[in-house]
């Protein structure tokens, strides 16, 4: 089975070491452009752009990189509760049209109550998933060309519709990750691809089986993806030295402070990541060639595949055998590691070819929209 491999744009910072300013690198537009263009040239199918208060805005970053890339797809965040589903649908359609079908969307409910409160969202975990399900329903239907009336517990819209359709039909794919039962229910019912963070294969297998069964009960099928860091070198010994170097400047206080902050999250996925290492720097190889060192101080994806090209490819195949067809990778620093992954890992993988959709013949009305709602009609010839 061919696999899709994405890279990552580090809009929240980059460098040679975790948790340290030593070896840090300024992340400005020029640098992000270098990474995006490298990923485009090297054969990555797309890039994940992170979201949150520690990041640059993912939509603006994606839009700014459209003109300087050719085939690269952009996986950007949808934030239920922070933006209306109708406005989000218009923005999604615009990004898809401007990029000629290179837009992908990642539903992010959020897992840090403190950050969400700062955004004006004061729902608990259960309520957030209720609101996310309502948001996603409206967003999907509007993008698919329907006129939507919806009265839910959290979202109410009347006459919501889209005048400018997306390039991808019926709409751009929706990605989503979450480890709670509520998250899996949402994935089974409404998304195209369920993402998991890089847990050991046995744990990932359990999650896939649960989501697959829930989707089947609703008459749906769902694709699967995984989010991992990668440390690949010419030899496995070199790769492990590189992994240890990455956390060489981490002290116990920095780790403890990070873990205390993560403990305030209500994200089940973040809790599962923290349990893999227990906040300690020893015994970080939690499964063959799967290293939990990144998660000592980084929220979200906290594990890395470590080894030479053939070894890492073997571990990737183990995940692929579970049904995963999309791998979202990253590595520090992200520019150099994009080249390393391409040169040392790609020759051992069966990579899917990136295909762009055919441009729709009429994505723009002929003439100006009348009264903000009516598309001008062609005058009949007598």
From Swiss-Prot:
Annotated catalysed reactions: an alkanesulfonate + FMNH2 + O2 = an aldehyde + FMN + sulfite + H2O + 2 H(+)
Asked whether the keyword Oxidoreductase is assigned, the reply is yes
Please give the coiled-coil regions recorded for this protein.
Answer: none
KW rRNA processing (keyword) present: no
UniProt keywords, alphabetically: Flavoprotein, FMN, Monooxygenase, Oxidoreductase
Question: Of which family is this protein a member?
Answer: Belongs to the SsuD family.
Query: Do you know which PANTHER family this protein is assigned to?
Result: ALKANESULFONATE MONOOXYGENASE, ALKANESULFONATE MONOOXYGENASE-RELATED
Additional observations:
FMNH(2) which is absolutely required for this enzymatic reaction, is provided by SsuE.
Q: How does it assemble?
A: Homotetramer.
Stated name of the protein: Alkanesulfonate monooxygenase
Q: Which organism is it from?
A: Yersinia pestis
Tell me the organism's taxonomic lineage: Bacteria, Pseudomonadati, Pseudomonadota, Gammaproteobacteria, Enterobacterales
